[in-house]
């Protein structure tokens, strides 16, 4: 997978390209991340990349010409088929379904805004989609872009040790993840649930599903509203609710 990034702070993306799972993906040529800095497309000695908004008001906007030229350069490097995404509080909120959609693309160009944002005409002419990571404001689009890259990269074949890891993560089936345990067997008086040490794989599967349903019901009940639960899931959820309320 190829991802191009337009950012005034490309150095920030070393966190993605040099560390952890995504760093290994880059090292093994499963993921390629290229960055373009709009400052490198300026023509004045100060490398100006911000400009005043028409109509006045606080703050500045990213200057059109350097940003536009950076986007065009990234598009040329990507070739055909690249989807251009602007990270914006006004965008569609990123969730696991959205991550799965974006992971189907082999080429993405991520535009990271700064200041008060970018000219609306650039959004109309250069941007394919706007995405947000939540209903709050950050100082720039770099952290949302890194979040998106990390989430999408998990679906690239070979990036995770087991592809099942991505398929069984929280939200992969619309539910929160179940609790997990490792050694020691007893920690400050708290023990590992016996079923997890039983060796009965079917019982372990049912326990994990039941815990996942219960955790979603207790912590994020709105997630259940849009799910078409199976007969087994409905049965296990009723059991979990009865146990919790008893």
Swiss-Prot record:
GO cellular component: a single term: cytosol
Top-level taxon: Bacteria
Sites where the protein binds S-adenosyl-L-methionine: 113, 133-138
One Pfam family it belongs to: tRNA_m1G_MT
Subcellular localization: Cytoplasm
UniProt-listed InterPro entries: Alpha/beta_knot_MTases, tRNA_m1G_MeTrfase_C_sf, tRNA_m1G_MeTrfase_TrmD, tRNA_m1G_MTases_N, tRNA_MeTrfase_TRMD/TRM10
Assigned EC number: 2.1.1.228
A molecular function GO annotation: tRNA (guanine(37)-N1)-methyltransferase activity
Reactions it catalyzes: guanosine(37) in tRNA + S-adenosyl-L-methionine = N(1)-methylguanosine(37) in tRNA + S-adenosyl-L-homocysteine + H(+)
Keywords: Cytoplasm, Methyltransferase, S-adenosyl-L-methionine, Transferase, tRNA processing
Main location: cytoplasm
Gene Ontology biological process terms in this record: tRNA N1-guanine methylation
Entry-linked NCBIfam families: PRK00026.1 (NF000648), trmD (TIGR00088)
Quaternary context: Homodimer.
Task of the protein: Specifically methylates guanosine-37 in various tRNAs.
Family indicated by similarity: Belongs to the RNA methyltransferase TrmD family.
Protein name (database record): tRNA (guanine-N(1)-)-methyltransferase
Gene: trmD
